[in-house]
Amino acid sequence: MGKEKKTESYNNDSGSYNYRMFKFYNRKFKINEVTPTDDVRDAFCQFAVGGGGGGTDGDSSDGDGSTGVMGAEQLCSFLDDHGESTTVAEAQRLIDEVIRRRHHVTRFTRHGLDLDDFFNFLFYDDLNPPITPHVHQDMTAPLSHYFIYTGHNSYLTGNQLSSDCSEVPVIKALQRGVRVIELDLWPNSTGTDINVLHGRTLTTPVPLMKCLKSIRDYAFSSSPYPVIITLEDHLTPDLQAKVAEMATQIFGQMLYYPESDSLLEFPSPASLLHRIIISTKPPKEYLESRNPIVKQKDNNVSPSSEDETPRTEEIQTLESMLFDQDFESKSDSDQEDEEASEDQKPAYKRLITIHAGKPKGTVKEEMKVVVDKVRRLSLSEQELDRTCSSNSQDVVRFTQRNLLRIYPKGTRFNSSNYKPLIGWTHGAQMIAFNMQGYGKSLWLMHGMFRANGGCGYVKKPNFLMKKGFHDEVFDPRKKLPVKETLKVKVYMGDGWRMDFSHTHFDAYSPPDFYTKMFIVGVPADNAKKKTKIIEDNWYPIWDEEFSFPLTVPELALLRIEVREYDMSEKDDFGGQTCLPVAELRPGIRSVPLYDKKGEKMKSVRLLMRFIFE
């Protein structure tokens, strides 16, 4: 695919593109000059000196902004008017940066922004981003008060059945800001070491040592807040002890040790800066789970599974690999071996900060809040759906103190993902996603965790943590009054001409772009809108405004997608993004777009305005 040379200016000299029609005929399309919109021009005129609005010196000359200049004080006033508290020095830094990019000169030869400079400033997404780019939420509450960026089978490079296992996806996830890494631990072929792989499949293993070293090296490459390693271990006590030894040696001071076997309350992200914590089932619970027949007789319940295949199959495989080798009969010597292994378990058990489990009885029973300890419970997406339909209040109450992890259903062999909002709206902290399962659900995940500076922890709204006089809690299905209305104006887009060849979207003419917008949140807030199609233009100017009434804006996401209209085939993809509504910065903003994998596109941006009423 050919690339056009990128220019940093959005006010380019006019040119043209030639498209070959039939065999001998060339069709020429003029490239229109990109100019400031009326709203941009009005904003400049209002604040610039000599811009017609008076600026700070009362000059109100021609009113079109063409001769005005916006200095540091005027830019500071503009930013203050947009709800941003800034200093004159910071405003001057922004002016200097715009002038450097556009004119390659210093402020000693240019002292302020003209209209085109101001227009370009608004279109630079690093200088004028749509959401707050730094951590701004309280990070001192217990972990259960946060949505946490969570991966599922973090070591897989592709599908759930036959892809390679590798440390590379773990590294990529950490670099993106994921804070919960899942590793499935199995004995190697000789039973003397530990591999990471998706059991009972054709996935190729990767040594645990590689994964742990990668976590150590990249854990805090994008965020200083704690990394949680969830272990699904299928190991003998001897190998569990080896895991403890590996983790201790590799992580060193990074590894967090809980002060007691059971916590009354989880520690806070702020108290765990640059720490790695472990979450798994305690060894005793694991040993019991390896002989579910006995447990079933005792409890008259069937075990549940977090894995993608039935639990009975897992048990059969585990028994053939481990149980039959070491615990086939209960002779005296076997009992002695088990007692000897107790000497090794404490080292492994001591690592576990977040005790995990799966429902042994009904989910309703498992979700009863225990006063003297906190824990993590794992449910499949189907179990969550059923539980939220019948006992949604129990889910919200449980997640006020405990951690709830949701994982994909077993039929998602292609590593696709589910809709995350049902979990978030019920307070579930760990919505475990396949980070290689590209698509709209993963775009929502990316969007949620752009919040709070992209640190991987997003504070849950206060209403999810409160109880009423009669122990009632938030119900996402309850119809509530509109709290505020979000008005979104889509001015224009640019950057495709720089990132794509001129025939990428259409071999015979420039592209026909349109923008779709979706609100995804509680059921009452879900909505979608679409702009008109702008034909044959690399610089689409829509200049359309849409209103979204919101009952629970704190849990709403704004998903944006640009498509290129195709009369005969499926419309082409032109970029996407997803933004947390609660994080949107009011005013005119530059909104960068991302590709289907969630990677930021080099040049493609939209100019938009957000207003809350």
From Swiss-Prot:
The keyword Nucleotide-binding does not apply. Its EC number is 3.1.4.11. This is Phosphoinositide phospholipase C 6. Pfam families: C2, PI-PLC-X, PI-PLC-Y. Residues 466-595 form the C2 domain. Residues 137-281 form the PI-PLC X-box domain. Its cofactor is Ca(2+). Expressed in leaves, flowers and siliques, but not in roots. It comes from Arabidopsis thaliana. Residues 349-465 form the PI-PLC Y-box domain. One of its GO terms (biological process) is lipid catabolic process. The keyword Cell wall biogenesis/degradation does not apply. It catalyses: a 1,2-diacyl-sn-glycero-3-phospho-(1D-myo-inositol-4,5-bisphosphate) + H2O = 1D-myo-inositol 1,4,5-trisphosphate + a 1,2-diacyl-sn-glycerol + H(+). The production of the second messenger molecules diacylglycerol (DAG) and inositol 1,4,5-trisphosphate (IP3) is mediated by activated phosphatidylinositol-specific phospholipase C enzymes.
